[in-house]
Amino acid sequence: MSDDEYGDIDAAVWDEAEALTQASQTLPSNFPHRRKRRRIGSEELDDGFLSGRRRGSHGFSRSDNDEADEKKSKYRIHLGAEEVPAAVIMGATQADEMPDSSPYRIRGPIYKRPRRSPPMELEQKSSPAQPSMVESAKTQKQNIVHSPQPTAQYDFSRELEDLPSDAFSPSPPQLRMSSIPITISSSPPLESTQSVRSQRLAAPQNGLRQTTLFGGRAPNQVPSSTQAKKVHKYLVDKVPEPPTHHTLDEEAIKTWIYPNNLGAERRYQYTIVHKGLFNNLLVALPTGLGKTFIAATIMLNFFRWTTDSQIVFMAPTKPLVSQQVKACFEIAGIPRSSTTMLTGDQSPALRAEEWAEKRVFFMTPQTVENDLKTGIADPKKIALIVVDEAHRATGNYAYTKVVQFLRRFNESFRVLALTATPGSSVEAVQEVIDNLEIAEVEIRTEDSIDIKEYVHRRDITEILIDPSDEIIMIRELFSKALQPLVNLLCSQKAYYNKDPMGLTQYGMLTARKAWMASGAGKSAQMSIKGMMNALFTVLTSMGHAIKLLNFHGIGPFFSNIKDFRAEVEGNKKGGKYKNQIVNSPEFKKMMERIQGWINKEDFIGHPKLTYLCDTVLNHFLDAGAGLMGDNMPPSSTRVIVFTEYRDSAEDIARVLNKHGPMIRASVFVGQSDSKRSEGMNQEKQLETIRKFKAGGINVIVATSIGEEGLDIGEVDLIVCYDSSSSPIRMLQRMGRTGRKRAGKIVLLLMRGKEEDSYKKSKDNYEQIQRMISSGSRFTFRHDLSARIIPRKVKPEVDKRFIEIPLENTQDPSLPEPKRRAKPRKKLAKKFHMPDGVETGFRKASKLNSNAESPLTKFGIKRKPSELNDDELAPVPLLDSVLLNAKDEAEHSRRFLKVPDGALEEVGMPDLTAQPITQRTLTRTAKVSHGKYTRSCVSLFNKLSRLQRPEDRDNKPYGDEPPSDFGSIPTMPLEAEVRARAPKAPKASDPAQVVKASRVAKTTSALKKAPASKRVAPKKAKPRRGRALRNDNSDSEDSTASMAMVSNLRSSQIPQPTPDSDEEGPGERVDRTSDMEELEADDDSDLGSLVDFIDPTQTQTQIPLTGTSNFSSSPPLMETWEDERINGNAVGGRRGMLPRAVEMTGAKNSSFKNGTMTQESSDGGDSMDSDFPTIEDLVRSDTTTTTTRKIADPPSSSVFSSGQKATPNMFTRKRDGDVRGRGLKRRVVESDDSDE
């Protein structure tokens, strides 16, 4: 087609056609720039849109006139071997693509990169009619929108004439098998004529999370395996649940009760109650919509379903606990006798009794936690736990710890969480869900359809306030006082805001933490660190004062600063920077001005107080104008003012009470005391609420204690004196009004920061409510929500009017337990052991028996192992059993030898090796003997007294041969005792001479006398005995022993007759002062002299003078030489005496009238000459020795004159003094009373 066919078209018409077709125009990349359109001839038009193909590149036909008139271009255009696809213009302007764009925006062509055409899909079955390549090319060419310039159609068939006819036919089946997708499936393939696409395999998506560019969650996200399980809708798909351990009432679980006591049924309450019976549920409802009713109904049904399980209701404050108690009594009708209210005021013993008897408990979470940890409460018996104000269940709060403790021992319990605001962020709400093991959420907002009819209108008014002139003046003075400290802090690059009025507590704490973690803080010297810590501490406290000044008034600010000044001036150690602030002239000027203003009665420290008084007065005036009814007094309405600090609350109440009696204001604060005011205990809080409901008080100025959960009556006006960035607190405040009728909320906001904080809180609340309602951003714990009721049981609802028990209406007081006159026995401690655990010990002989096996009660018995008698046990090699030389050396080195050569042989510990020490309290330095040590010593002494005399020196169990004390010959004292001769017996009669017990002489005595003189005498002489002294004993005896010895020397005590069975008192062995604490009757009778005399002889008793105490110590065994008197041996064997006779220091001694007497003389031979020397003892062939067992090494001693020998007596050494110190010495007891 030639160009002459369009030569008669007018230019205007062509422009219109060009505009209509330009939106989808295709421009090849090799086109030259458009030339200015001009008219060539009378019927020809040249517009510059000449295709390159028409220039002869592809053989297009052209007329001869055009070739003649065309001028050669001076630019050479290079054409590539392959044609580059041209860019596609979607529209000439943005208005074509985006018609809604603004007209002032820059418009231009929008280029879109052409996409590659998708490959042709091969059909599995060839169709009978296949289009040829030429027809496809023609069809594709028709789809392309050409330019208005007509072009000639090119016939491609000329270029394809040489190709075979089957070049474009489908390939054979055996050649195109690879292109057909292979599907592997367990089900047979479907017969279909359509092409089957291969299934796209998805990679595992565990732990992945797809989000949008703006941080939102992408739709259709596959939950990871770590998240909670999906909600199964069919019973066959659900995981089997183990049966509960709680005892259920089979008849009661068939129905569940919904009370109709409060009037018409609310559908949302019914839905929430039904879901809360079978799932761990989080209920988020605006205040005043019946959360208390929902909790009471669920508690009632679990009280019916279980027979002995327990139900716990927890609330953070005591007023909230008492509020729920009344709801359960008046709505659910739970018997009062089965309920109790426990707090920290009751003793643990009283709470333990309540846990053992009652079933329903109203408690604070801290008390529940303590009772569970101490074993007072049994976690396995709890079936339902109700958590009020559940948004507190974050971090380490008591709610979290209680649920965690229950989960350790109890897998079957229900959790019901109640709150008005679940959290201030998505993370906080998720933490509450995880800590309380929530599986379902029921949330309603004020815009929800099913609660709109029960929510009254709330008018919210925001009042923006500017600071007063007084506040601006105080800011300037206080800023100048703090400016040097702020500059010093900024110089260290720890803080960057040089305006002191911008200080906040949070900002200071954050800056301090950041500086300490930075490199400058870590590398700083200790002096710099101390300076920075002091600066941060002072400015943090000043940040709180600035907040009081800006948002609460001059009064609270002055109270805080006055305490700061008193602390610095009073202690005189306030620190350098505190003194710098207090002593600055600006600070002093500021305090003087504030003091002058405070002294005025009509002074108002903040413009908020002015607006507050106007708002409250207008509200009461409007109420009196008839808004509350014609018969209602003006003060019948109620107002609550919320503030953050107690000082501010007291200032507000003071200003409001100036407008009495119309306004009767009272503060409502917590229980803790502050520096300037005391708190309100539970009784005062309840009394204030009662007066507020009754009308005695019509305005309450409350802190955060009044924000959560309290039902403080019908409130028509809420005034928020300060704003909070927490949406939870703001919503709790606003929920106090609009319950029974329309309410009004007034917000007093300072321009700037407080205004922005409120807007942030409002937006945050709305966003969180939408997220919780959708549930797409949270993960729920369906795996921990047990149904408790068997799945085969489907309880039916029973809507009825609950009859309140008579006991619930008679006593209006709270069910607090009273202290009993006589406390009961303390309950046994519970150790929270798992069920079925085997306590105590098992004998090794019964390990294989089935009698005590835990599985025996289930009918499972252990199969006894049968031994094959025919099979012999393998006999090991002898070398593998016995020890070789190397093993024996190792055994001797490790087990038989000890280093240092102390003891070569190591034996078993012998408890009888030190009997004296076991029966004696040894010396102590700083720590005295304990109760059990004294008891053991007393026990050993008593056992010693009960032992037979002849076995007292024998080791038990036959470790040593019995002693030969019974074979000692009769003492020659018997004849003299019977004769009672007035004169001393003759020395020639050896039978009448009593040989005193001998011991080794001292070294000095042995050196004095020569060896020739130290021989056995031919004539018996009265001699004094030698006593033993214990070197290791205490040098100073006890006071009791010294007094006893002194009495013996100064007086003569009558002695019993010889025929009497009475034995004289002996001396008490007292090695330390601790022995005085033993019992007075610890005296032991270890035997007498008669016990060692031949039993064939007539036994007599030696009456001795003096007094003594019975000794509880074992006898000391001495080595004696056989004595021969006048050539006649007293005994043919050694004489072994268990105790040494104590004699006084007399030179001659004899027995007169059955009593041993002593004569003192200054002259005479040395009495030491009568004793054998050590050489004589060594040379004696007939002398036999016995091992001497004594606790301490012996030493020499002397006798004191003028004292008669007494049994079991110790005396102390004295040189030449009759009244000297006595030496402790053991003597032979001459009493056969033990026989």
Curated annotation (Swiss-Prot):
Ranges of residues in domain Helicase ATP-binding: 272-440
Compositional bias ranges of the Basic and acidic residues kind: 61-72, 947-958, 1065-1074
Q: What GO terms are given for molecular function?
A: 3'-5' DNA helicase activity; ATP binding; ATP hydrolysis activity; four-way junction DNA binding; four-way junction helicase activity
Q: Cross-referenced SUPFAM superfamilies, in alphabetical order?
A: P-loop containing nucleoside triphosphate hydrolases
The principal location of this protein is: nucleus
What does the UniProt record say this protein does? ATP-dependent DNA helicase involved in DNA damage repair by homologous recombination and in genome maintenance. Capable of unwinding D-loops. Plays a role in limiting crossover recombinants during mitotic DNA double-strand break (DSB) repair. Component of a FANCM-MHF complex which promotes gene conversion at blocked replication forks, probably by reversal of the stalled fork.
Q: What is this protein called?
A: ATP-dependent DNA helicase mph1
Q: Which organism is it from?
A: Sclerotinia sclerotiorum (strain ATCC 18683 / 1980 / Ss-1)
Q: Which gene encodes it?
A: mph1
